[in-house]
Amino acid sequence: MPAPQPLLPLLFAFVLIHLTSETNLLPEPGSHPGMCPNQLSPHLWVDAQSTCERECTRDQDCAASEKCCTNVCGLQSCVAARFPSGGPATPETAASCEDFQCPQQGSNCDIWDGQPVCRCRDRCEKEPSFTCASDGLTYYNRCYMDAEACLRGLHLHVVPCKHILSWPPSSPGPPETTARPTPGAAPMPPALYNSPSPQAVHVGGTASLHCDVSGRPPPAVTWEKQSHQRENLIMRPDQMYGNVVVTSIGQLVLYNAQLEDAGLYTCTARNAAGLLRADFPLSVLQRATTQDRDPGVLALAECQPDTQACVGPPTPHHVLWRFDPQRGSCMTFPALKCDGAARGFETYEACQQACVRGPGDVCALPPVQGPCQGWEPRWAYSPLLQQCHPFIYSGCEGNSNNFESRESCEDACPVPRTPPCRACRLKSKLALSLCRSDFAIVGRLTEVLEEPEAAGGIARVALDDVLKDDKMGLKFLGTKYLEVTLSGMDWACPCPNVTVGDGPLVIMGEVREGVAVLDANSYVRAASEKRVKKIVELLEKKACELLNRFQD
């Protein structure tokens, strides 16, 4: 029969095309590991490859964690490489990560196309352990710092954290002007423009969570979804995670929402001045209408911890909101059916309304700047750092975590109040301390850096006057600022206490190998007029020379 003969060349052509397409998926020599975003999901082309900057012709023109991909302009640009969930299938004889070293900080070995490669870690522990890094930023814990170092191809190390000793200066402008006043150039911790509000979408819908923050320098934004696992996935800008994309402006967009996507999405914004974390609740609803529940006893019962043993696995891909006593608010839990009914709420708002009594803890709210232009200096409490910090309020649409002074903030919020430290007892009185010291200065603290591991730190002092200087030549050199090393400091109750007060201090200490040093026996007191006058009189009368003669 002559009719079937054309099928043979068609079949051959199909096999050839199939083999060609499979060959194109193999990595080219010298190419970077991973895939272009559109190779994983064509729906996210615009979100991931909308930039037409950073042109390239091959992967070698990009950073090690990037691919050279076609952009929307018809050219090619460097884009963060994507990896499918679980990575590509590899044969049983694939290479292992044994004896394979990843020199980059924050990277781990992974297998890609049968070869060991280094990938930046993207999951970190949920427990906070705030870490100040050499790039001037504060990280939630050290894992976050290592992950950021890998992403940027840097080496970061831990440095002492800085204290904010007073309100940063600002320039509000004269009252008669109508131009928008600009805050001063001092670093400012991150603050939200608007308060996070719960969102609810139906299955298959799209949700957009915008972590719109201010701060100086501009804060870096990451996202993570809260879970009951030990580690959370860190989601960074300009990257795709399944059906979730984080845009370059820190906006999280979730496509084709499913029931299991419901939960608390936490935005973390950080800069050199501080750290902010804000929860954005997202509920995903089934399109089928559900019967309204009795908001009375049944709702109250569902707020209680579920102590009843349930037979069988949880409902597949279904989560409900329940009150979490540890968080003090509602969170998602896998839906368990006991006696034919799943305990919990379909939305975050319904759970909060039924289970959370009272207005809630204002100190747990993130600082909100607001969208207006009437700049005012305010204070907000950070539950992460457990201290009050300054921020700039625009004059409208804020929240209750907004105080006019540091004192009112500390009175309203749970600032750790350890038993009061005993007053630092001086080993010697003023005259004897002056004679035993190598220097005596009057100055104002501008910065204090703690080094708890070394039981020390550094204090930077703006000099008002040099009363005595035997070894450093401060007056001769015209020194305006002095860096003093703090030795043997117990930062729980530091002596001498260099962390209190904004006024001038009288500081006396030793000079060791050309470095000014303060220890527990050093003299540090407020620079009252009477005290400074007494020191000047002792020096003019050469009291120290007389004292040395008597001791000899």
From Swiss-Prot:
**Domain WAP intervals:** 29-82
Its name, as the record gives it, is WAP, Kazal, immunoglobulin, Kunitz and NTR domain-containing protein 1
- Kindly state the tissue distribution recorded for this protein: Preferentially expressed in the developing inner ear and the dorsal neural tube.
UniProt-listed SMART domains: IG, IGc2, KU, WAP
InterPro entries (UniProt xref): Elafin-like_sf (IPR036645), Ig-like_dom (IPR007110), Ig-like_dom_sf (IPR036179), Ig-like_fold (IPR013783), Ig_sub (IPR003599), Ig_sub2 (IPR003598), Kazal_dom (IPR002350), Kazal_dom_sf (IPR036058)
What gene name is listed for this protein? Wfikkn1
Q: Any idea what job this protein has? A: Protease-inhibitor that contains multiple distinct protease inhibitor domains. Probably has serine protease- and metalloprotease-inhibitor activity.
Write out the annotated subcellular location. Secreted
**Annotated disulfide bonds:** 36-69, 52-73, 56-68, 62-78, 120-150, 124-143, 132-161, 211-267, 303-355, 310-338, 330-351, 363-413, 372-396, 388-409, 421-493, 424-495, 435-544
Originating species: Rattus norvegicus
Q: What is known of its domains?
A: The second BPTI/Kunitz inhibitor domain is able to inhibit trypsin. It has however no activity toward chymotrypsin, elastase, plasmin, pancreatic kallikrein, lung tryptase, plasma kallikrein, thrombin, urokinase or tissue plasminogen activator.
Q: Is Metal-binding set as a keyword in this record?
A: no
Where would I find the Ig-like C2-type domain in this sequence? Answer: 190-283
Q: Which residues form the Kazal-like domain?
A: 112-163
